[in-house]
Curated annotation (Swiss-Prot):
Protein name per its UniProtKB record: Archaeal histone A
Family stated for the protein in its record: Belongs to the archaeal histone HMF family.
Gene3D superfamilies assigned: Histone, subunit A
Source species, domain of life: Archaea
Amino acid sequence: MGELPIAPVDRLIRKAGAERVSEQAAKVLAEYLEEYAIEIAKKAVEFARHAGRKTVKVEDIKLAIKS
């Protein structure tokens, strides 16, 4: 884990209205977002394979998010 940089996550939290963000808070959210993104990606890969493709397309990602 730890693929997502902390700075963009910090900016997301600030966009949500926070004035200050602890480094630990940004790290925890980054870890959660990464886990969630991996789950979506895994589902999208399944959809692409089911369709007989090796390439994950936008529609695979959208379906994975909805499922």
